[in-house]
Amino acid sequence: MKDKSIKVLEFNKIQEILKNYTCTKAAKDIIEDLKPYDSVYEVREHLEETKEAFKLLITKGAPPFEGVYDIRNGIYLAEKGSALLPGQLLKIAAVLRCARRFKEYINHKEEEESYRVLENICEGIFSLPKIEEEIFNAIEGEDEIADRASSILYNIRRSLKEKNYSVRDKINSLVRSYSSYLQENIYTVRGDRYVLPVKVEHKGAVPGLVHDQSSTGATLFIEPMSLVNLNNEIKELMLKEKAEIERILTVLSAKINANITGVKTDANIVWELDFIFAKAKFASEYNCTCPTINDEGIVDIIEGRHPLIDRREVVPISVKLGEEFTSLMITGPNTGGKTVTLKTVGLIHLMAMSGLMIPARENSVISYFNNVFADIGDEQSIEQSLSTFSSHMKNIVEIMDKADENSLVLFDELGAGTDPTEGAALAISILENLRKRGAKIIATTHYSELKAYALRKEGVENASVEFDVETLRPTYRLLIGIPGKSNAFEISKRLGLPDYIIDFARENISNENIRFEELIQNLQEKSIKAQEDARLAENLKLERDKEKKKYEEKLEGLQKVRDNALIDARREAKNIIKEAKEEADKILKDIRQLERMGYSSDARRKLEEERKKLKDKLDSIEEKEIKTVHKGEALKNVKEGDEVLLASINQKVIVLSKPDNKGDVLVQAGIMKITANIKDLRAAKGSNFNINSSKTKKSKKLNLNLRKVESSVDLRGMDAEEAIYTVDKYLDEAYLGGLGEVTIVHGKGTGVLRKTIMDMLKGHPHVKRHRLGEYGEGGTGVTVVEIK
């Protein structure tokens, strides 16, 4: 990629903006060296990393870059074996912490979206939490070592504190004793030693060592002789403290040296992540999207914006190239935005090929080019005595030497600066040569000959920048398929040039040229009208979609209200059923209690009648609930092997027998075999009948009719194996039937059958608890089971 083109397209300004989003000097240096990558694979990977970082910013917020530093100098010194300063060690620990936290930041649950490229980068992080912890534990600030850094340092500092207290007590006493000889009744410190400010005329009155003199010479700072030994002890402790601090720093630095590979790797990854997230922050700030990348020369920029133009003023442009045509000729008046269009296309390509998201709409397409050549602006060189034309031509010669089918070439005012006829002919020749090589070209021009060239040459298309003649201002919108016109006569007329001069000028233009310009104007007007109609249609569609979404949300809300009401009603019905069944079980217990107490069978009969009425009422409620949940007609006939829906438990079952004369059939639900009536069977249609399986499981034991399951089972006369099978089957039916308590009659006999049944009940999934019958229930001849 030519450095000159990169400079002309102002990619360096994008780099400077990008640096503002970094946290470290190292990341800024990465950006300084940023250039388009050498392969389409690299471009896609670096765009993907930017896209992933962009998503993470949205979903997880700011990355953990707090307190991250450029530690290259510290790493260099540690690698050489030097002892690092506390601040350098702290910064290294901060970078290690950042690397460790980043692994946590990028971690995601299985069901969440993964971040392939960033996860691959973070896999290289060593994570050195022990070193990180030791440094943070030992160092509290840039120049402050913590007491807890070592037990030796702690003891030294404690002794130092005690000595300082002793010296201060002693010197305060001396201040009071020598107060008449002192400049002020205070003590001070000179060279880490406690001294008194003695008036120079009384220096003989305070025996001691002179350490300093005031600037006026009126005061001598004297260390009293009685403090010399104490001050010496303090000085010794301070030297020991310094030596211990140096030892601690040396040990920590040695640990960095021993793990230098991990430290360097973690630091480099953190700086790379700093760079990647700077790209993502830039994309967020400039409303960028990730384009689709191809290497086939196909370009489709949708509403691209030049990132260096004020976002409140920039006009988006849409540019296509590479499919229907490979060359685009942009014509129109000066200051109309032609050059901005060239720079926008070129800069967006440089950004994308450097792994940056682009300021354009979603679904934009960018092609990977080996080279982007740009001849834009006035490159006149006074030093080299080159004219504008010569300067441009020198640049064009370089382009012609290197451009091929993998090149994007941008020409601004190709052929300008010389005789119009020769310039136009030369421009057409250059364009045609590059087109035949397969290069993709966008060129701006004033020449009508180039408009005609685009009209007659296959693979070349005209375009123009729209100009509002009413306001004499360009709109900066790009119109592909329509050649531009200079609008010189219209502009001159509106600026006040007399009509007779304009008319005379028109007479000097051939009728053919006039008709051509009128045709262009007509095409422009139609194109503008078509675009306005398209924008209006798009706005109407968006408005319609917005209204549709609003009504769909309202409908969904109403549906939720209806569903919630239905759920509440069903829940209430089930609560009634549950309470009523509990009441039925209570009645059964009352009956047994009355029997034990010796009440007449008449009382039992009345209670049984009450229980029967209650059961009938429950059955009615259950049947209504089943009908609301499972609409549809009952099956008239079934055969063995049919898969049907048993409505009472809302579950698919397999028919095992034909209906008997009462309509009862044997069906299998999972591992259980159940007798059901054909009226309770429905046609099974895929998953349509599986209405909320989680709720079904909870309601199974409530939805089976009580009248189908007896409250007791008699095992007398059965052997152990037959009894176990019978009880297991019975408990399944009792559980599904919603019975709270049942009685198993096994008789007293030898007790073998009772023991077998008791052992079985201990681990049965439907049994909450069990006990032997009480007096009046059958005693030890029965077992009473409470169902879960």
From Swiss-Prot:
Protein name per Swiss-Prot or TrEMBL: Endonuclease MutS2
Source taxon at top rank: Bacteria
Keyword ATP-binding tagged: yes
Keywords recorded for this protein, A-Z: ATP-binding, DNA-binding, Endonuclease, Hydrolase, Nuclease, Nucleotide-binding, RNA-binding, rRNA-binding
Assembly notes: Homodimer. Binds to stalled ribosomes, contacting rRNA.
GO BP: any one term: mismatch repair
Binding site for ATP: G332, P333, N334, T335, G336, G337, K338, T339
Family: Belongs to the DNA mismatch repair MutS family. MutS2 subfamily.
GO molecular function: ATP binding; ATP hydrolysis activity; ATP-dependent DNA damage sensor activity; endonuclease activity; mismatched DNA binding; ribosomal large subunit binding; rRNA binding
